[in-house]
Amino acid sequence: MLLPMAATAQSWTADNGNGTFTNPLFYDEFSDPDILRVGDDYYLAGTTMHAVPGLVILHSKDLVNWENISYCFDRFDFTEDRFSLKNHEEIYGQGVWAPCIRYANGQFYVYTNVNGKGLQCYTAKDIHGPWEHHNMKGNIYDLSVLFDDDGKIYAIHGYGEVKCTELEPDMSGPKEGTTRTIIHEGNGVGEGHHMYKIDGMYYLISTDYRPNGRTRCSRSKSIWGPYETRVITADETYGYHAASLTQVPRGVKYRIGEDGTKFALGHVDKDATACTNAHQGGIVQFKDGTWWALLMQDFHSIGRTVCLMPMTWTDGWPMIGFKGNYGRAPRTWFNPGTALGYYGLGEPVDNPHAPYVRSENFDAKQLGRVWQWNHNPDDKQWSLRSGKLRLNSLPAEQLMWARNTLTQRVIGPTSVATVELYVKGLKDGDVCGLGNINVPCSWIGIVKNGKALTLRCFEQLTNDTIDTTIELPKGKSWLRCIGDYDNDQAQYAYSTDGVNFQTMGRMMPLSYQLISFQGSRHALFAFNTKGKQGGYAEFDNFTVDEPMADRSKNIPFDKTFRIINLATNRPAVCDPHGLLYDSRPNDQGRLTQFQLVDRGTGQVSLKCVDGRYVKVYGEGLAGDVRFTTDPKEAEVFLWQDYLNQEFMLLSLKNHRYLGKSPTTGSPYSMDYAGPDPARRNGSVLKWEEVKAEN
C-alpha cells in the first residue's frame, strides 16, 4: 500500500475559533492536572512519571489555549541505577506522581512524590525557573498542599482514610507528630486530593476508582473536620468506554516483560466506564468570577487527557455542570469569560494555539519542550549537530531497556509521525528507528549485521518480526507511524525516497496499561544488541501530521443532510403528525433531510427542508420535540462535536441533549443527561450529507 507524504501542519487545540472550545484541551496525555491562578495567569502542572525533563508546567490566559513554559528539573538528581535504566533497573510508571502547584510568599511551590524517595518539593521565584529541589522525604503521595491563613502549611494525603499533616515552613519535611485522620475509611473518598479554602470553608476535591471513576467534594469549617461529602461529577465519559488493559503473565523476569513474553490485551467492555469518567483534577475561579474544573479522563492508548468543565455553586457545593444536569458537562462550551450565568455568547480568541510544537527539524541548539527522555539520559552519548539529532548506540537487549531514547506523546484522534533516519554511522549489532514506548512496545527500524542492513518491523505483543533486505546507497530512509488512537491501533510504514511509503506489518492493536502508567509515545532510538557500544544513528525532520486537527468543517453548514441515530441506525424524520421521530433505515425522502441555521458561536437551529424548524416544547419530554414555521421560535442548540461527523445537540434551556430511546419506540425528547460509553443510548447522532441530484 502506497501512502502519500504527510502535508498539514495544524495541531489540535480545544479552541474552535468561534468563541467555543471542545474537550479534551489537549488530545495527548497530561495526567493528574493541578491548576493554579496567580492574578490573571493560570498554571497547570502534571505527572511525568519516568520521563525527563520532569514536572511539566503549562501557562494560559484563558484556560483554553495553553503553552508549555517550564519543567521543574532537567533530570532526576537521584543516583540509583533505576532512574537511568542501568543494570536492568527501571522506574517505569514510577518517578514523579500527581503534583500540586501553589504560590505563596512570593514564590512558586510544586510538590510531588517519587517512588522510594518520598515527598519532594521544587521552589522558584520565577515560574520559568531556576527551580530548587527540596527532598522532604516522608510517606506522603497524591497530596494537596494548603497555605492557610494562619501561616501553617498542610498536606492532605491518603486513599480512603484521608490524613492531614503539617509541613515545616522551610520545606525540610513533615512536622513530626502532626498527622491526623480527617476523613475515615467508609465515606467513599479516594485519593488525588485538591484542597481549597473558599470563603472560610475548606473544600477537598478527591477522586475514586472503585468500582469506577468519579469525583467527590468534601467540605468542613475546620481543616481537621468533620467533613460532609458528595459526588460532584459521575458518568461523564464523553462517549468513551473502558480501555483494554495490557495483561503481563506472572513469573516474567521483568515488570515490563521481555521479547518472547506472551502479553495479552484485556477484554473491551464498551458499556463500561472504568476510569474513562472524568476524575482527578483541580478547580479554579476565572477572573470573571465563574468557576471551572480541569479533570483528567482516560482516552485509551492516548493516555489520560484533560477536560475543562464549567461549574455551578449550589447550596455551597461546587457542582460540575449546570442546573438541570448536575454532574455532567458539555464537551463543547463557551470560552471562559463569556459563559456568564447559564449560557452566553462566546468571543473568539485572537490566537488559538496548541501547547506544544510537535514537529522538529533539530536545527536549534536545544530540543523542543515537547521532547522527553525515557529515564535519565547519558548526556555524553547524544548531541545536536549539523541540523540532526545524533544518538550513540548503547548496549541493550530491546527497546524498553535502550538508554537515550527520545520520546514525545502521541496525539489523537489520528496522527501520522514521520522521521528521516541516517544510518551510515551504524556498526555491527546496531538497531535504530522509530518506536512506540508502551507495554508491549513496537518499532520499525534498521538493523546492521556485519555489513548488511535489514529493515525490520517488530511487534512485542505477538513477538512478530518482519525483515526485509534494504539498499540505502545514501544511507537515508524515512520511517512513519500511522496512528488511529481513538480506535487504539497503529501501523508502520517506510520510504526510500520520502514520497512513496509502503506499509509494513499489520495494523497493531494498542492499549493502556498500569506498568508505565502512560499512553503511547513516539520514540527515536539507537541501541546495540551485542553487549557493546556501537556506532550512531542520526535523525532529522520529525513531523507530526494531524488530519483531524482542523475541525472548521465539522458543523455541516451549507449542506443538506440526514441525521442518523447511532443507537437505532435510523434517520430522524419530520413526521407529518408533528413529532421528531425515526424512519426506516434507508429512507432518503425529503422529510429526513435537514439543514442548519447558523446562530453564531457554535449555536444552531435545525430546519427541515420542507420549511419547518425544530422546536422544543414544555419540559422536553418524549413528544415535546416538535416543529414551528416561525424561524424566530426555532430552538437554539449548542453543537457538540464528537468527530467523524458524530455530534450531539445541547439545549441552552435545560442543559440536556436531544435523543431517542432505542428500545421504547418513543419519539425524540430533550431530556438526555449525556452519552453512554458506547454512544448507543440514543443521544449521539451522525450527519450524512445528501448530495444534490444532477
Q: What positions do the PLM features span?
A:
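Bacterial Sec-dependent N-terminal signal peptides
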Residues: 1-10
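Carbohydrate-active catalytic/glycan-binding domains of CAZyme proteins
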Residues: 9-555, 591-595, 634-638
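Lectin-like carbohydrate-binding module/patch detector with strong preference for beta-trefoil
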Residues: 552-694
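Compositionally biased, intrinsically disordered/low-complexity regions enriched for serine, proline
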Residues: 1, 21, 30, 96, ...
